[in-house]
Amino acid sequence: MLELFSTCPQSRDLPADQYRQRVADVAAWSDRAGYRGILVYTDNQIVDPWLVAQVVIESTEQLCPLVAVQPVYMHPYTVANMVSSFAHIYGRRIFLNMVAGGFRNDLLALGDQTEHAERYARVVEYALLVKRLLLGERVSFTGRYYSVENLTLTPPLPPDLFPGIFVSGSSDSGVAAARAIGATAVKYPKPPHEEISTSADGAGIGMRVGIIARDDDSRAWKVARARFPEDRKGQISHALAMKVSDSQWHRQLSQLGAEPPSAENPYWLGPFENYKTFCPYLVGSYTTVAIELARYIELGFETFILDIPPDEEELQHAAVAFEQASRRAPA
């Protein structure tokens, strides 16, 4: 069964007096569109994701905040306590998006010098400790990164509100971490013909992708290029970000931009290369985009986290493409 998530606006992209209302609006659009949840980012330059998650909860009926969790920011107990507190106060479910952290300078600023592979090992230990607490265990544990003694979680979490857990990462280490946790691995996808089947990975699989779909290819590309024009300043920022990132997905996507997009190749990295977003886009007619989505679904992708929507109509356009893709993909 496919699960769709949108993405919440970032505080650095809007004036402070407009940000809260914009979060509420995007969340409400996503809720009305029937999405499972909405991704809430975390990093050193934006507001706290748990406070944003509260705005999402208070602005919607069913939408689940998918909160990005970076181990360097808070103890595993604090994350478990936040999940159970939302359940206790609002009766609502939270999803967790575990991130290892791809921008090394952000980690160094916080005094964290953990290497790339070790950061995924830390994510595994962190997430398994969170899970044990949320399952109601009394936990005594001494690991490589964390140690607790007779720790329990109060208030306890109702079993039906146990969080969905994702691990963000396109590397083998990221997929292995998701498998160890029993989580969904979220990738930044290559074009479908370059992806391999995920059915044997032992972990659920999802992707971050943007979609611009319209009645025909030319109209979709007109919208896409107007929304994401070439930006020399953005290209320079992208190049600088590459130098301070040890993320495999960042390098992979940067190497994929040589083939020009077209009706035959709707996979587009223009927004990524101009530093407007971090995910690839699928651009074209509903049918063109649906064919690409169906190929991903056939490869085992079941969770799709779409980019920040500019308006409610964009979610409706994406829904048409997904509806067609679901009919094309084998049951």
Where are the model-predicted features located?
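N-terminal beta1-alpha1-beta2 module of alpha/beta enzyme domains
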Residues: 1-62, 163
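Hydrophobic faces of well-ordered beta-strands that scaffold small-molecule active sites
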Residues: 2-9, 38-40, 64-69, 94-98, ...
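Active-site mouth loops of central-metabolism enzymes
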Residues: 2-21, 68-72, 76, 159-169, ...
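Acidic (Asp/Glu)-rich catalytic clusters
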Residues: 31-32, 53-62, 83-94, 179-180, ...
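Short, acidic/polar
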Residues: 15-29, 169-177, 285-295
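An alpha-helical appendage that flanks or caps ligand/catalytic pockets
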Residues: 110, 116-157, 192-297
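Catalytic domains of carbohydrate-active enzymes, especially glycoside hydrolases
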Residues: 22-41, 177-187, 295-301
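Alpha-helix-loop-beta-strand connector modules within alpha/beta enzyme cores
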Residues: 49-70, 122, 126, 320-331
